Amino acid sequence: MMMVARVATAEHVGSAGASLPQTPGSRSFALGAHPGPQKRIGGPAQGQTAFITPLVTPDGIYSRPSSPYMQASPLLKGSESGGSAGSPQSPDAPSSASGASVGNAIGSGYTGNVSVAIRIKPSESSTKDPWYASNDRLIHTEFGEFQFDHVFTKGVCNQEVYQALGVPIIDKLFEGYNATIFAYGMTGSGKTFTMSGNKQEPGLIPQCVGNIFDRISSEHHGASLAYEVKVSYLEIYNEKIYDLLNYVDRQAGSTGQPSRNATGLKIRDDSKYGVKVVDLTEQLVSSHEDVMKWIATGDRNRKTGETDFNTRSSRSHAIVLLRLTRYDLKTGSEATSTLSLCDLAGSERAVTQIVRRKEGAFINKSLLALGTVIAKLSMLGSQANGLQPSPAAGHIPYRDSKLTRILQPALTGDSIITTICTIDSKAESSTETTNTVRFASRAKNIALNVRKNEMDSHAEKDTIIQNLRKQLDEQHETIVMLRRSAAAPSGNGSTSPLDSPGVGGTSLSERTHNMEKGLLEVENSILKTKLEHCEKLLDKDMMVLEDPHVREIVEMLPLDIASVLESKVQGMESQLRQYRVYVQKLESDLLKAQRNIITTHSVQFNRQSTANVQEKYGSDVDIELLLEEQEAELMELRNALKRKDKMIEALQSARRLRDSALSPTTTVLLQRKESVIDPRDPQPV
């Protein structure tokens, strides 16, 4: 027994970013509820099909006869969950947010609403269509009038769609904004044709790619900018993500389908892109032909199948990612912007085939999650426009599906988004068309602030780097010159400044080397002295107490107390002796170092003054550097002397502390000693 259940049709709602600037022929309207009276005429009863008289013909507009059914319009349900987003509006009603979808560039950001376009699929049926378009308005006598940024009628070609939607998106892409275009609609309504097209009539994807490389070619003539383009292609099939450009995952067979493992690719949070598909292939491309070749490869790997509406229908959501990186060759900075071109699978009713029913369930689940996200964002947009806040606008469930998870950065203000919703105006598709229009109405209510991926000039940092590089080059040249002059004398027999003889017949380079060697030996000796000092402090000093008063006090105390006190005093005296020896050693080393420096200075400049050296050899950088090094060494020795003084002060403080600790004990012992009666003293009578 086979159970055939109807899969819940999504009240789909699409991805949102920020709207595009106003283009020729486009108008933006607020979709708030019409304050005036509305005509509410219901549709057909459940299970019945209504064949409605056409509202527009080549000869004009006809009035529609009254419907025998007086039920509430299903479109009015949108006002219950989505505020005014799903409510029709009279053409004469005032717009509370007129021009909301027209973005405004403020500083380094972009504000506006989602740009929404409707495209009506041409119908060959003789049945009269209930929907018609007029001046970017979609009109249905029962449901009312809906106004969008663009409404493309049946005679509009892909080139016109691209001029209205694609060109502004590419302009914003080159300004540094991320951009997203996605097609939404029921199965067989023309989404894939709008996005991909055919050889005779290319769709949005090939035309956007061509425009990108045309812009790169025109802007590349200036030598200050360089561009890099990478392409990726993924699909979401049965809530799993697959890489359509990964040849490794292809099965060895004639099916031509990629192997779909049990897990698919994973999504991870990314600091740069918001979210990132791990291990997704990125192919570097250099021309329009390269991109289309990779997209064709992905199309062959994409999962398709036959449905009731199409012989070759998309059974997965497909997303083409184009990453455009712009390099400023003058400053070395870069900026990356991403164009996402999404062809979403269409919702459909359950079918009898098990595979198709499973695919449809996953598709409807993801579209339903997308619809929920859009509905909540629409509520937030209504609150931003000053309308009454809705209690349902709380947590936004981006993680309910892979589709909403990937679109999360765009929906949260990381991308300018244009949505093109394709509908079939036939009466047989009335339910799906109604859901699509409700989706478009809610999406248009979303307001976002899009961040711009600006090229960080770092002017101050670049100046510092240039100065440091210049200084490094100068020092490198000086070092090379010194090494050459120290290696061999010049060809005319003259000696270099470093090789000029000084006192004792030694050259300056030799004296410098000897001085450095002496300083290293002094430093090594000081370190050895410190090590010996620390080792001695670890050993317990068992020398007899030198202070006779302290020895007398210790002898008068009980044995246990006397031993403890003697041990403590011995340790303190041992430390004092070690400190004295250490201080004397430091003073001796410091005196020797000062004498060596004075001697070195006299050796260097004894026979010739600084003025004579400069007169003979010009501005001698070597001597200046040597003087600077000696100044630094002298400063280190002075610091060592300061540390010695601080150490002496610490020892003196410890001595005072010891004296203060022993003074009460000494007083008590002396008093006790005086109280003892000496037998030799005369006894009182």
From Swiss-Prot:
Give the UniProt subcellular location, in the record's own words: Cytoplasm, Cytoskeleton
Spell out the Low complexity composition-biased ranges: 86-101
- Keyword check for Cell cycle, yes or no: yes
> What GO biological process term is on the record, naming one?
negative regulation of microtubule depolymerization
Gene Ontology cellular-component terms for this entry are:
cortical microtubule plus-end; cytoplasm; kinesin complex; microtubule; spindle pole body
Q: Where is this region: Disordered?
A: 11-46, 63-101, 485-510
List, for all copies, the residue spans of the domain called Kinesin motor. 113-446
GO terms assigned for molecular function: ATP binding; ATP hydrolysis activity; microtubule binding; microtubule motor activity; microtubule plus end polymerase; plus-end-directed microtubule motor activity
Q: Which residues form a coiled coil?
A: 464-486, 520-663
- Any Pfam family hit: Kinesin
Which protein family is named in the record?
Answer: Belongs to the TRAFAC class myosin-kinesin ATPase superfamily. Kinesin family.
What this chain does, per the entry, is described as: Required for assembly of the mitotic spindle.
Name it.
Kinesin-like protein KIP2
